[in-house]
């Protein structure tokens, strides 16, 4: 019903373990949207301590592991030439830029992070910034800067988004 409301007419939703999609649907999809489970830092409210109740460093590590598995599966399920959008509602670099860096290391030149295409002008523009170049002394690949961090404001909750194009097959025989 949500897809119909948005005017999407050619959509396949996967119900099941997303980390296994690629095993059943290897290089089958033109477009993939991976809105990954995360530590939800972008949804914290300063005046509501309840929003941080389940946050911990351990939660970030747990989510990072899950996200890496999901992103691997999403890339493997994407057709060469296809586009994947990876998003989270957290600011943790381990879950965002770190996850992208791991994918680049795993897939090499078969994937490319391209500009996320968020507006450079208008009411949201002041809240949009490029992905981090480094975190805690660890440099990320330059391509990771093409991702976008959106800071929370009166219009939006905070989130992270990256657009990845699959340049060639990732199936290795």
Please report, for each region that a protein language model flagged, where it lies by residue.
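S-adenosylmethionine
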Residues: 1-173
């Amino acid at each position: 019903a949500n897809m119909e409301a948005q005017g999407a007419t050619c959509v396949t939703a996967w119900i099941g373990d997303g980390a296994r999609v690629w095993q059943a649907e290897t290089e089958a999809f033109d477009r993939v949207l991976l809105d990954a489970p995360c530590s939800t830092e972008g949804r914290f409210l300063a005046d509501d301590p309840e929003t941080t109740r389940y946050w911990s460093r351990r939660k970030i590590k747990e989510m990072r592991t899950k996200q890496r598995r999901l992103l691997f599966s999403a890339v493997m399920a994407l057709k060469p030439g296809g586009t994947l959008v990876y998003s989270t509602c957290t600011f943790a670099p381990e879950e965002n830029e770190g996850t992208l860096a791991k994918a680049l290391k795993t897939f090499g030149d078969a994937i490319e992070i391209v500009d996320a295409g968020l507006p450079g002008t208008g009411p949201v523009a002041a809240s949009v910034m490029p992905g981090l170049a480094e975190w805690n002394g660890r440099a990320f690949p330059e391509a990771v800067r093409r991702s976008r961090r959106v800071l929370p404001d009166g219009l939006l909750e905070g989130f992270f988004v990256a657009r990845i194009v699959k340049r060639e097959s990732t199936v290795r025989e």
